[in-house]
Amino acid sequence: MRRLSAAVMTLVLCLAGATGAGAHAFLERADPRVGSTVHTSPAQVRLWFTEQLEPAFSSVRVVNEGGQQVDKGDAQVDPAAPKQLRISLSPLPPGTYKVIWRVLSVDTHVTEGNFTFRVAL
């Protein structure tokens, strides 16, 4: 019985360690929301992740349907909220926009992705 308890405890500890080591910064939510239609041009895009981000190696950009960048190039991780990445936008005319992000979490794992939102004034 003791051997079984020791084996179970070892397995639990190994699994607990593996979960922490495997943590990545996944996109948790966004504003504007993923796939949404907004009726006013947003002033910025904000992205929330599941892990703290490494500011020097995290980026986001926003492009229009023609692939032209429409953000102000001022992407930054919020110092007061290290899981949030944001970027300012110029006023956007109606259309579909793609948000492209690439982040490095403080646990040194890179994740990247993209999504679209639509402006319909």
Locate each region found by the language model.
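Short strand-edge motifs at loop-to-beta-strand transitions and within beta-strands
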Residues: 83-87
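A glycine-anchored, Pro-Gly-centered beta-turn/N-cap motif
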Residues: 41, 88, 93-102
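Short, surface-exposed alpha-helix to beta-strand junction/turn motifs within ectodomains of secreted
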Residues: 45-46, 51-73
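Bacterial N-terminal signal peptides that target proteins for export
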Residues: 1-8
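Extended, polar beta-sheet/loop recognition surfaces of beta-rich domains
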Residues: 40, 44-51, 108-121
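N-terminal edge beta-strand
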Residues: 22-41
